[in-house]
């Protein structure tokens, strides 16, 4: 049975939180960049040091699980959103899309079939030019340190901004 590295505890639909969490998936310091950066550094590493030859692909594989976890969290936050007639979940005319357009990323509903997308919180597409693979192991590891540190900072900020237990 396939399981995520962390169990997601469903709370309540929250398309606003899903939109914000897109930054952690497809933003400049997001998991997609981190995954691809380790992938390219791993593939392009030509050094003879086997410990680094083993480390980089290992971290790349771990980052795949992070992308999957963030995608599943976004999807959980989008589940059942825009479908209820509860106050605050529809517009004045009762149309489910009203709430999605007003508070969420409309692309989650229109393009993404109410699921995660390879974009940041503003809806900008993920950008491969953010990936750094210099061919210099020390420079690559320093870039990774900044990337990982900034990613943790952003995740912490988003976690502290929401009371939704899905995070």
Regions found by a protein language model. Give the residues of each.
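Non-heme di-metal
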Residues: 1-167
């Amino acid at each position: 049975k396939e399981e995520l590295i962390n169990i997601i505890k469903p709370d309540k639909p929250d398309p606003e939180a899903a939109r914000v969490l897109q930054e952690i998936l497809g933003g400049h310091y997001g998991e997609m960049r981190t995954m691809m950066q380790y992938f390219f550094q791993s593939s392009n590493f030509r050094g003879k040091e086997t410990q680094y030859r083993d480390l980089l692909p290992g971290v790349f594989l771990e980052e795949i699980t992070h992308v999957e976890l963030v995608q599943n969290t976004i999807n959980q936050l989008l589940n059942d959103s825009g479908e209820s007639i509860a106050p605050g979940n529809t517009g004045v005319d009762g149309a489910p899309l009203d709430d999605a357009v007003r508070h969420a990323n409309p692309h989650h509903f229109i393009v993404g079939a109410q699921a995660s997308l390879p974009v940041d919180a503003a809806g900008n597409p993920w950008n491969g030019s953010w990936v750094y693979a210099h061919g210099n192991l020390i420079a690559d590891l320093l870039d990774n340190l900044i990337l990982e540190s900034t990613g943790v900072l952003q995740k912490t900020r988003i976690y502290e901004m929401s009371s939704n237990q899905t995070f």
